[in-house]
Amino acid sequence: MRILVFLWLGLSSLFAVDATLEVVKKFANMPSIIVEDSSTREVERGLTLRVYKMLVGDLKVSSHFNVQEGGASSFDMVMDYGAYRQKKVDLVAKVKAGREGSGILAELRLYDVNSGDSVFAKSYTVAREDRYPFVAHKMAIDINNYIKAPSIDWMNRFVVLSKYTAPSESQIVVADYTLTFQNVIIKDGRLNIFPKWANEQQDAIYYTKYLTKPTLFRYNLYTGESRKITESEGMLVASDVSADGKKLLLTMAPHTQSDIFLFDTQTGTRKQLTRYPGIDVSAHFIEDERRIMFISDRLGYPNVFATGLDGSETVEQMVFHGRNNNAASAFGQYIVYSSRESSNEFDTNTFNLYLVSTKSDYIRRLTANGVNQMPRFSQDGETVMYLKHNGAQSALGVIRLNYNKSYLFPLPSGKIQSMDW
Protein backbone atom coordinates (compact mmCIF):
# COMPACT_ATOMS: atom_id res chain seq x y z
CA MET A 1 0.00 0.00 0.00
CA ARG A 2 1.46 3.34 -1.06
CA ILE A 3 0.56 6.00 1.51
CA LEU A 4 1.66 9.58 2.00
CA VAL A 5 0.57 10.85 5.41
CA PHE A 6 0.01 14.45 6.51
CA LEU A 7 -1.08 15.96 9.79
CA TRP A 8 -4.25 17.96 9.32
CA LEU A 9 -3.99 21.71 9.69
CA GLY A 10 -4.77 22.77 13.24
CA LEU A 11 -5.29 20.69 16.35
CA SER A 12 -8.90 21.50 17.11
CA SER A 13 -11.76 19.77 15.32
CA LEU A 14 -15.12 20.91 14.10
CA PHE A 15 -16.39 17.38 14.62
CA ALA A 16 -16.78 15.97 18.13
CA VAL A 17 -14.06 13.75 19.60
CA ASP A 18 -16.51 11.51 21.48
CA ALA A 19 -15.68 8.65 19.11
CA THR A 20 -12.01 8.76 20.09
CA LEU A 21 -12.88 8.92 23.77
CA GLU A 22 -14.95 5.73 23.51
CA VAL A 23 -11.94 3.85 22.14
CA VAL A 24 -9.68 5.27 24.84
CA LYS A 25 -12.13 4.33 27.61
CA LYS A 26 -12.05 0.66 26.64
CA PHE A 27 -8.26 0.41 26.70
CA ALA A 28 -7.21 3.33 28.98
CA ASN A 29 -5.20 4.69 26.02
CA MET A 30 -5.42 4.38 22.26
CA PRO A 31 -5.03 0.59 21.85
CA SER A 32 -1.69 -0.69 20.61
CA ILE A 33 -1.90 -3.57 18.13
CA ILE A 34 0.88 -5.69 16.69
CA VAL A 35 0.32 -7.53 13.38
CA GLU A 36 2.25 -10.77 12.85
CA ASP A 37 2.91 -13.01 9.84
CA SER A 38 1.66 -16.54 10.54
CA SER A 39 2.46 -18.15 7.19
CA THR A 40 4.18 -21.51 7.61
CA ARG A 41 4.85 -22.50 3.99
CA GLU A 42 7.09 -20.70 1.53
CA VAL A 43 4.30 -20.69 -1.04
CA GLU A 44 2.11 -18.67 1.38
CA ARG A 45 4.63 -16.00 2.31
CA GLY A 46 4.39 -13.64 -0.64
CA LEU A 47 0.60 -13.46 -0.55
CA THR A 48 0.52 -13.28 3.24
CA LEU A 49 2.98 -10.38 3.16
CA ARG A 50 0.71 -8.43 0.80
CA VAL A 51 -2.36 -8.96 2.99
CA TYR A 52 -0.26 -8.21 6.10
CA LYS A 53 1.05 -4.90 4.70
CA MET A 54 -2.41 -3.84 3.57
CA LEU A 55 -3.89 -4.65 6.99
CA VAL A 56 -1.18 -2.60 8.73
CA GLY A 57 -1.99 0.31 6.43
CA ASP A 58 -5.75 -0.01 7.00
CA LEU A 59 -5.34 0.03 10.77
CA LYS A 60 -3.19 3.15 10.52
CA VAL A 61 -5.72 4.89 8.27
CA SER A 62 -8.52 4.04 10.73
CA SER A 63 -6.69 6.29 13.25
CA HIS A 64 -8.04 4.09 16.06
CA PHE A 65 -4.83 2.17 16.81
CA ASN A 66 -1.14 2.54 17.52
CA VAL A 67 0.12 -0.02 15.00
CA GLN A 68 3.28 -2.11 15.20
CA GLU A 69 4.65 -4.53 12.62
CA GLY A 70 5.66 -7.83 14.20
CA GLY A 71 7.67 -10.75 12.89
CA ALA A 72 6.80 -14.34 12.08
CA SER A 73 4.55 -16.13 14.59
CA SER A 74 2.59 -19.23 13.61
CA PHE A 75 -0.90 -20.00 14.83
CA ASP A 76 0.51 -23.00 16.74
CA MET A 77 2.85 -20.96 18.93
CA VAL A 78 1.75 -20.56 22.55
CA MET A 79 0.82 -16.95 23.30
CA ASP A 80 3.16 -15.32 25.82
CA TYR A 81 0.78 -12.62 27.05
CA GLY A 82 3.26 -11.44 29.68
CA ALA A 83 5.86 -10.59 27.04
CA TYR A 84 3.30 -8.58 25.07
CA ARG A 85 2.20 -6.74 28.21
CA GLN A 86 5.80 -5.70 28.87
CA LYS A 87 5.83 -4.17 25.38
CA LYS A 88 2.54 -2.38 26.20
CA VAL A 89 0.70 -4.24 23.44
CA ASP A 90 -3.08 -4.52 23.81
CA LEU A 91 -3.99 -6.63 20.78
CA VAL A 92 -2.21 -9.19 18.62
CA ALA A 93 -3.42 -9.93 15.08
CA LYS A 94 -1.98 -13.03 13.39
CA VAL A 95 -2.49 -13.28 9.64
CA LYS A 96 -1.86 -15.82 6.92
CA ALA A 97 -3.12 -16.19 3.36
CA GLY A 98 -2.88 -18.78 0.62
CA ARG A 99 -4.20 -19.41 -2.85
CA GLU A 100 -7.38 -21.40 -3.29
CA GLY A 101 -8.04 -22.01 -6.96
CA SER A 102 -7.90 -18.61 -8.65
CA GLY A 103 -8.79 -16.86 -5.41
CA ILE A 104 -7.57 -16.47 -1.84
CA LEU A 105 -8.29 -18.10 1.50
CA ALA A 106 -6.97 -15.99 4.38
CA GLU A 107 -7.15 -16.37 8.16
CA LEU A 108 -7.05 -13.87 11.00
CA ARG A 109 -6.70 -14.63 14.70
CA LEU A 110 -7.10 -11.78 17.16
CA TYR A 111 -5.88 -11.92 20.77
CA ASP A 112 -6.69 -9.52 23.62
CA VAL A 113 -3.50 -9.24 25.66
CA ASN A 114 -5.16 -7.52 28.63
CA SER A 115 -7.74 -10.27 29.16
CA GLY A 116 -5.43 -13.05 28.00
CA ASP A 117 -8.05 -14.35 25.60
CA SER A 118 -8.30 -15.43 22.00
CA VAL A 119 -10.97 -13.04 20.73
CA PHE A 120 -11.86 -14.64 17.41
CA ALA A 121 -10.57 -16.70 14.52
CA LYS A 122 -12.05 -15.91 11.11
CA SER A 123 -11.54 -17.02 7.53
CA TYR A 124 -11.89 -14.75 4.50
CA THR A 125 -12.23 -15.67 0.85
CA VAL A 126 -12.22 -13.75 -2.43
CA ALA A 127 -12.66 -15.26 -5.87
CA ARG A 128 -9.74 -13.43 -7.49
CA GLU A 129 -6.21 -13.03 -6.17
CA ASP A 130 -5.97 -9.39 -7.25
CA ARG A 131 -8.82 -8.60 -4.83
CA TYR A 132 -6.58 -9.32 -1.83
CA PRO A 133 -6.86 -5.70 -0.57
CA PHE A 134 -10.51 -6.39 0.29
CA VAL A 135 -9.43 -9.34 2.46
CA ALA A 136 -7.30 -6.94 4.50
CA HIS A 137 -10.05 -4.29 4.54
CA LYS A 138 -12.52 -6.82 5.99
CA MET A 139 -9.97 -7.89 8.60
CA ALA A 140 -9.43 -4.27 9.64
CA ILE A 141 -13.19 -3.73 9.93
CA ASP A 142 -13.57 -6.80 12.16
CA ILE A 143 -10.69 -5.74 14.42
CA ASN A 144 -12.11 -2.22 14.59
CA ASN A 145 -15.56 -3.59 15.49
CA TYR A 146 -14.04 -5.57 18.37
CA ILE A 147 -12.85 -2.41 20.10
CA LYS A 148 -16.23 -0.79 19.34
CA ALA A 149 -14.61 2.12 17.53
CA PRO A 150 -16.57 4.22 15.01
CA SER A 151 -17.26 2.31 11.82
CA ILE A 152 -14.66 2.05 9.07
CA ASP A 153 -17.00 0.07 6.78
CA TRP A 154 -16.23 2.62 4.05
CA MET A 155 -12.91 0.81 3.53
CA ASN A 156 -14.76 -2.13 1.98
CA ARG A 157 -16.60 0.01 -0.58
CA PHE A 158 -15.58 0.23 -4.21
CA VAL A 159 -14.37 3.47 -5.75
CA VAL A 160 -15.34 4.07 -9.38
CA LEU A 161 -13.23 6.48 -11.40
CA SER A 162 -12.55 7.68 -14.91
CA LYS A 163 -8.91 8.00 -15.93
CA TYR A 164 -7.45 9.49 -19.09
CA THR A 165 -5.43 7.09 -21.24
CA ALA A 166 -4.93 9.22 -24.38
CA PRO A 167 -6.24 12.48 -25.85
CA SER A 168 -10.07 12.26 -25.98
CA GLU A 169 -9.94 8.77 -24.49
CA SER A 170 -10.62 7.51 -20.98
CA GLN A 171 -11.47 4.31 -19.16
CA ILE A 172 -13.87 3.59 -16.30
CA VAL A 173 -12.16 1.71 -13.47
CA VAL A 174 -13.45 0.08 -10.28
CA ALA A 175 -10.90 0.14 -7.45
CA ASP A 176 -10.43 -0.13 -3.72
CA TYR A 177 -9.77 3.07 -1.78
CA THR A 178 -5.99 2.57 -1.91
CA LEU A 179 -6.01 2.07 -5.71
CA THR A 180 -4.09 -1.19 -5.17
CA PHE A 181 -6.93 -3.17 -6.75
CA GLN A 182 -8.06 -1.82 -10.12
CA ASN A 183 -10.41 -3.41 -12.64
CA VAL A 184 -11.14 -1.70 -15.97
CA ILE A 185 -14.85 -2.07 -16.78
CA ILE A 186 -15.30 0.40 -19.69
CA LYS A 187 -12.58 0.50 -22.36
CA ASP A 188 -13.60 1.29 -25.92
CA GLY A 189 -11.28 4.04 -27.18
CA ARG A 190 -13.84 6.77 -26.47
CA LEU A 191 -14.20 9.46 -23.83
CA ASN A 192 -16.03 7.85 -20.88
CA ILE A 193 -16.35 10.25 -17.96
CA PHE A 194 -18.19 11.18 -14.76
CA PRO A 195 -19.00 7.70 -13.39
CA LYS A 196 -21.61 7.65 -10.61
CA TRP A 197 -22.79 4.71 -8.52
CA ALA A 198 -26.38 3.85 -9.43
CA ASN A 199 -27.32 2.40 -6.03
CA GLU A 200 -26.15 1.51 -2.54
CA GLN A 201 -25.33 -2.06 -3.64
CA GLN A 202 -22.68 -0.74 -6.05
CA ASP A 203 -23.72 -3.19 -8.76
CA ALA A 204 -24.27 -0.56 -11.47
CA ILE A 205 -23.01 2.87 -12.52
CA TYR A 206 -24.11 5.79 -14.65
CA TYR A 207 -21.52 7.39 -16.89
CA THR A 208 -21.29 9.78 -19.83
CA LYS A 209 -19.93 8.63 -23.19
CA TYR A 210 -19.10 11.16 -25.89
CA LEU A 211 -20.71 9.98 -29.13
CA THR A 212 -22.23 12.40 -31.66
CA LYS A 213 -23.84 13.88 -28.54
CA PRO A 214 -22.95 13.38 -24.87
CA THR A 215 -24.92 10.24 -23.94
CA LEU A 216 -25.73 8.87 -20.49
CA PHE A 217 -25.48 5.10 -20.01
CA ARG A 218 -26.22 2.74 -17.14
CA TYR A 219 -23.72 -0.12 -16.87
CA ASN A 220 -24.33 -3.31 -14.86
CA LEU A 221 -21.07 -4.52 -13.30
CA TYR A 222 -22.22 -8.14 -13.06
CA THR A 223 -23.84 -8.65 -16.47
CA GLY A 224 -21.72 -6.21 -18.47
CA GLU A 225 -24.86 -4.69 -20.01
CA SER A 226 -24.74 -1.00 -21.01
CA ARG A 227 -28.14 0.66 -21.46
CA LYS A 228 -28.66 4.11 -22.96
CA ILE A 229 -30.59 6.45 -20.63
CA THR A 230 -30.69 9.81 -22.42
CA GLU A 231 -28.63 12.25 -24.51
CA SER A 232 -28.20 16.01 -24.73
CA GLU A 233 -26.46 18.71 -26.68
CA GLY A 234 -23.49 20.43 -25.06
CA MET A 235 -22.97 18.44 -21.89
CA LEU A 236 -24.62 15.70 -19.83
CA VAL A 237 -23.54 14.53 -16.38
CA ALA A 238 -25.32 12.45 -13.72
CA SER A 239 -24.16 14.13 -10.50
CA ASP A 240 -26.36 12.38 -7.91
CA VAL A 241 -28.80 9.49 -7.45
CA SER A 242 -31.68 9.38 -4.97
CA ALA A 243 -31.55 6.83 -2.15
CA ASP A 244 -34.15 4.62 -3.85
CA GLY A 245 -32.38 4.90 -7.21
CA LYS A 246 -35.46 6.27 -8.95
CA LYS A 247 -34.32 9.86 -9.49
CA LEU A 248 -31.18 11.35 -11.03
CA LEU A 249 -29.84 14.87 -10.87
CA LEU A 250 -28.49 15.74 -14.30
CA THR A 251 -26.46 18.66 -15.57
CA MET A 252 -27.61 19.27 -19.14
CA ALA A 253 -27.08 22.01 -21.70
CA PRO A 254 -29.83 21.55 -24.30
CA HIS A 255 -29.80 25.29 -25.08
CA THR A 256 -26.12 26.30 -24.82
CA GLN A 257 -25.95 27.06 -21.05
CA SER A 258 -26.03 24.27 -18.47
CA ASP A 259 -28.92 23.80 -16.02
CA ILE A 260 -30.00 21.24 -13.44
CA PHE A 261 -32.66 18.65 -14.28
CA LEU A 262 -34.45 15.99 -12.20
CA PHE A 263 -34.72 12.76 -14.20
CA ASP A 264 -37.18 9.97 -13.39
CA THR A 265 -35.55 6.60 -14.17
CA GLN A 266 -38.92 4.81 -14.11
CA THR A 267 -40.71 6.99 -16.68
CA GLY A 268 -37.81 8.61 -18.53
CA THR A 269 -39.28 12.07 -17.92
CA ARG A 270 -37.27 15.06 -16.73
CA LYS A 271 -38.05 18.27 -14.86
CA GLN A 272 -35.95 21.43 -15.14
CA LEU A 273 -34.98 22.77 -11.70
CA THR A 274 -32.87 25.82 -12.64
CA ARG A 275 -33.21 28.31 -15.50
CA TYR A 276 -30.29 30.66 -14.99
CA PRO A 277 -28.72 32.25 -18.14
CA GLY A 278 -25.28 31.17 -16.96
CA ILE A 279 -23.73 28.01 -15.55
CA ASP A 280 -25.50 25.68 -13.08
CA VAL A 281 -23.76 22.31 -12.57
CA SER A 282 -22.97 19.45 -10.16
CA ALA A 283 -26.19 19.15 -8.16
CA HIS A 284 -26.52 16.91 -5.08
CA PHE A 285 -29.51 15.98 -2.96
CA ILE A 286 -29.50 17.50 0.55
CA GLU A 287 -31.83 17.67 3.57
CA ASP A 288 -33.33 14.18 3.09
CA GLU A 289 -33.73 14.88 -0.63
CA ARG A 290 -36.06 17.82 -0.05
CA ARG A 291 -33.60 20.24 -1.70
CA ILE A 292 -30.53 20.22 -3.91
CA MET A 293 -27.12 21.88 -3.62
CA PHE A 294 -25.32 22.92 -6.79
CA ILE A 295 -22.53 25.09 -8.22
CA SER A 296 -23.44 28.28 -10.10
CA ASP A 297 -21.69 31.40 -11.40
CA ARG A 298 -24.71 33.63 -10.68
CA LEU A 299 -22.53 35.87 -8.46
CA GLY A 300 -20.04 36.33 -11.28
CA TYR A 301 -17.86 33.48 -9.97
CA PRO A 302 -18.54 29.82 -9.06
CA ASN A 303 -20.12 29.29 -5.65
CA VAL A 304 -22.37 26.87 -3.76
CA PHE A 305 -26.15 27.37 -3.78
CA ALA A 306 -29.29 25.45 -2.84
CA THR A 307 -32.84 25.32 -4.17
CA GLY A 308 -35.97 23.21 -3.83
CA LEU A 309 -37.24 20.43 -6.05
CA ASP A 310 -40.40 22.31 -6.99
CA GLY A 311 -38.74 24.28 -9.78
CA SER A 312 -39.59 27.60 -8.11
CA GLU A 313 -36.02 28.84 -8.70
CA THR A 314 -35.79 30.33 -5.21
CA VAL A 315 -32.04 30.08 -4.61
CA GLU A 316 -30.05 30.30 -1.36
CA GLN A 317 -26.31 30.96 -1.14
CA MET A 318 -24.70 28.25 1.02
CA VAL A 319 -21.02 29.29 1.21
CA PHE A 320 -19.74 32.79 1.99
CA HIS A 321 -15.99 32.22 1.87
CA GLY A 322 -13.89 32.15 -1.29
CA ARG A 323 -14.27 33.64 -4.76
CA ASN A 324 -14.13 30.47 -6.86
CA ASN A 325 -15.79 27.47 -5.21
CA ASN A 326 -16.20 24.88 -7.92
CA ALA A 327 -17.14 21.58 -6.22
CA ALA A 328 -18.96 20.59 -3.03
CA SER A 329 -20.39 17.71 -1.02
CA ALA A 330 -22.79 17.80 1.93
CA PHE A 331 -23.45 15.69 5.01
CA GLY A 332 -26.03 16.89 7.51
CA GLN A 333 -25.20 20.49 8.37
CA TYR A 334 -21.67 20.26 6.97
CA ILE A 335 -20.40 21.19 3.51
CA VAL A 336 -16.95 20.41 2.17
CA TYR A 337 -15.98 22.36 -0.94
CA SER A 338 -13.04 23.08 -3.22
CA SER A 339 -11.96 26.72 -3.55
CA ARG A 340 -9.46 28.22 -6.00
CA GLU A 341 -6.90 30.34 -4.13
CA SER A 342 -4.64 31.61 -6.90
CA SER A 343 -5.02 33.24 -10.30
CA ASN A 344 -2.02 32.07 -12.29
CA GLU A 345 -2.45 32.72 -15.99
CA PHE A 346 0.51 30.57 -17.06
CA ASP A 347 0.83 28.06 -14.22
CA THR A 348 -1.29 25.60 -12.23
CA ASN A 349 -3.68 27.21 -9.77
CA THR A 350 -4.07 26.12 -6.15
CA PHE A 351 -7.37 24.59 -5.04
CA ASN A 352 -7.88 23.82 -1.35
CA LEU A 353 -10.68 22.07 0.51
CA TYR A 354 -12.71 23.76 3.23
CA LEU A 355 -15.25 22.43 5.72
CA VAL A 356 -18.09 24.69 6.88
CA SER A 357 -21.26 24.35 8.92
CA THR A 358 -24.56 25.73 7.65
CA LYS A 359 -25.56 26.35 11.30
CA SER A 360 -22.66 28.68 12.18
CA ASP A 361 -19.89 30.78 10.64
CA TYR A 362 -17.22 28.20 11.52
CA ILE A 363 -14.82 27.31 8.69
CA ARG A 364 -11.79 25.02 8.54
CA ARG A 365 -9.22 24.52 5.82
CA LEU A 366 -8.58 20.82 5.18
CA THR A 367 -5.70 20.98 2.68
CA ALA A 368 -2.68 23.27 2.47
CA ASN A 369 -1.48 23.24 -1.13
CA GLY A 370 -1.83 21.72 -4.57
CA VAL A 371 -4.90 21.00 -6.66
CA ASN A 372 -7.52 19.37 -4.43
CA GLN A 373 -10.91 18.76 -6.03
CA MET A 374 -14.14 16.72 -6.08
CA PRO A 375 -14.57 16.14 -2.31
CA ARG A 376 -16.96 13.36 -1.27
CA PHE A 377 -18.23 12.59 2.23
CA SER A 378 -18.34 9.00 3.44
CA GLN A 379 -21.76 7.60 4.35
CA ASP A 380 -21.17 8.31 8.05
CA GLY A 381 -19.74 11.79 7.45
CA GLU A 382 -16.48 11.06 9.31
CA THR A 383 -14.26 10.77 6.24
CA VAL A 384 -13.76 12.84 3.09
CA MET A 385 -12.31 11.43 -0.12
CA TYR A 386 -11.03 13.78 -2.82
CA LEU A 387 -8.81 14.04 -5.89
CA LYS A 388 -5.34 15.55 -5.69
CA HIS A 389 -3.61 16.41 -8.96
CA ASN A 390 0.11 17.03 -9.41
CA GLY A 391 0.98 17.75 -13.01
CA ALA A 392 -0.10 14.77 -15.11
CA GLN A 393 -0.52 12.49 -12.08
CA SER A 394 -3.38 12.00 -9.64
CA ALA A 395 -4.00 10.55 -6.21
CA LEU A 396 -7.01 9.74 -4.07
CA GLY A 397 -6.91 11.64 -0.80
CA VAL A 398 -8.60 10.46 2.40
CA ILE A 399 -9.18 12.87 5.29
CA ARG A 400 -10.15 11.42 8.68
CA LEU A 401 -12.06 14.39 10.05
CA ASN A 402 -12.11 13.40 13.72
CA TYR A 403 -8.42 12.59 13.91
CA ASN A 404 -6.55 15.44 12.19
CA LYS A 405 -4.96 13.11 9.64
CA SER A 406 -5.02 12.72 5.88
CA TYR A 407 -3.58 10.17 3.47
CA LEU A 408 -2.75 10.10 -0.24
CA PHE A 409 -2.92 7.04 -2.51
CA PRO A 410 -1.26 7.82 -5.86
CA LEU A 411 -2.50 6.43 -9.16
CA PRO A 412 0.54 4.63 -10.69
CA SER A 413 -0.11 6.07 -14.15
CA GLY A 414 -2.60 8.34 -15.85
CA LYS A 415 -4.75 11.17 -14.54
CA ILE A 416 -8.12 10.79 -12.83
CA GLN A 417 -10.94 12.73 -14.46
CA SER A 418 -13.57 12.12 -11.76
CA MET A 419 -14.55 9.57 -9.12
CA ASP A 420 -17.36 8.38 -6.85
CA TRP A 421 -17.45 6.07 -3.83
UniProtKB/Swiss-Prot annotation:
InterPro entries: 6-blade_b-propeller_TolB-like, Tol-Pal_TolB, TolB_N. It holds the Pfam family TolB_N. It comes from the Bacteria. GO terms for cellular component: periplasmic space. One of its GO terms (biological process) is cell division. It is found in: Periplasm. Keywords: Cell cycle, Cell division, Periplasm, Signal. Residues 1-16 form the signal peptide. The Tol-Pal system is composed of five core proteins: the inner membrane proteins TolA, TolQ and TolR, the periplasmic protein TolB and the outer membrane protein Pal. They form a network linking the inner and outer membranes and the peptidoglycan layer. Belongs to the TolB family. NCBIfam families: PRK04043.1. Part of the Tol-Pal system, which plays a role in outer membrane invagination during cell division and is important for maintaining outer membrane integrity. This is Tol-Pal system protein TolB. It comes from Wolinella succinogenes (strain ATCC 29543 / DSM 1740 / CCUG 13145 / JCM 31913 / LMG 7466 / NCTC 11488 / FDC 602W).
